[in-house]
């Protein structure tokens, strides 16, 4: 094969790769738009009487996950199944955002941490990497860390809304989450930096709980006068 023929073949491979990436980008852009639309729903709990509308907001968010599953099915068809990590960077951030949204909705519904397997099911993908397009463990953990920041914000806004029991429950949840992360030996630099931010979320929530204690409102909360879940 001549040198020119070799480079023609290389250009063909480059073009094919670029075409795949362009098709992936189109689907990812649609996923990002869906995620933006979804974000306004659960975050509505921070506003005014949002706590009374939690079930309704969660239900609407879950309806959007139907769109996400359809878009995920489309994304799976855009690249060879055995090349997941070759193109992973294209959807990594939106997948982390969707993990956060799923975990926030589940927390608002049950005040528990959603499992990676449950998130994968919500998104219409696999938990096991051997089965194809899957939820990477580090993407799951990144989404959960975003949840921690959101709950720190929720603890503050709960007090403003007169719901004094919620920050206490959030504090218990976040402390358990922090204990869980301490069991991990994180090698990913980005994820480790994200985890470093968890201690600030813990501190922020502790300050809210301490303020409630100083004002005597924690007794009122544990006495059953706090807001509903």
From Swiss-Prot:
GO cellular component: cytoplasm; nucleus
Residues covered by region (DNA/RNA binding): 86-90
Gene Ontology biological process terms in this record: RNA metabolic process
Pfam families: Translin
Regions that span the bilayer: none
EC assignment: 3.1.-.-
A GO molecular-function descriptor: RNA binding
Keyword Repeat set for record: no
Location(s), subcellular: Cytoplasm; Nucleus
Alphabetically ordered keywords of this record: Cytoplasm, DNA-binding, Endonuclease, Hydrolase, Nuclease, Nucleus, RNA-binding
Residue span of region Leucine-zipper: 177-198
Sequence similarity: Belongs to the translin family.
Subunit structure: Ring-shaped heterooctamer of six TSN and two TSNAX subunits, DNA/RNA binding occurs inside the ring.
Record's function text: Exhibits both single-stranded and double-stranded endoribonuclease activity. May act as an activator of RNA-induced silencing complex (RISC) by facilitating endonucleolytic cleavage of the siRNA passenger strand.
Protein name: Translin
Species of provenance: Gallus gallus (Chicken)
Lineage: Eukaryota, Metazoa, Chordata, Craniata, Vertebrata
């Amino acid at each position: 094969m001549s040198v020119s023929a070799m480079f023609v073949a290389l250009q063909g491979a480059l073009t094919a790769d670029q075409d795949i990436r362009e098709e992936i980008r189109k689907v990812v852009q649609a996923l990002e738009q869906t995620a933006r639309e979804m974000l306004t729903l659960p975050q509505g709990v921070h506003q005014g009487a949002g706590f009374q509308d939690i079930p309704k907001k969660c239900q609407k968010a879950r309806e959007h996950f139907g769109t996400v599953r359809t878009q995920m099915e489309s994304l799976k068809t855009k690249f060879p199944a055995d090349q997941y990590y070759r193109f992973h960077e294209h959807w990594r951030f939106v997948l982390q955002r969707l993990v956060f949204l799923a975990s926030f909705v589940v927390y608002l519904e049950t005040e528990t941490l959603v499992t990676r397997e449950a998130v994968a099911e919500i998104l219409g993908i696999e938990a096991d990497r051997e089965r194809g397009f899957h939820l990477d463990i580090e993407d799951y953990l990144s989404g959960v860390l975003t949840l921690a920041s959101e709950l720190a914000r929720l603890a503050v806004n709960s007090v403003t809304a007169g719901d004094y029991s919620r920050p206490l429950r959030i504090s218990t949840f976040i402390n358990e989450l922090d204990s869980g992360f301490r069991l991990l030996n994180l090698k990913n630099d980005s994820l480790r930096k994200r985890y470093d931010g968890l201690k600030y979320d813990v501190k922020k929530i502790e300050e809210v709980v301490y303020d409630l204690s100083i004002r005597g409102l924690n007794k009122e909360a544990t006495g059953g006068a706090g807001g509903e879940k």
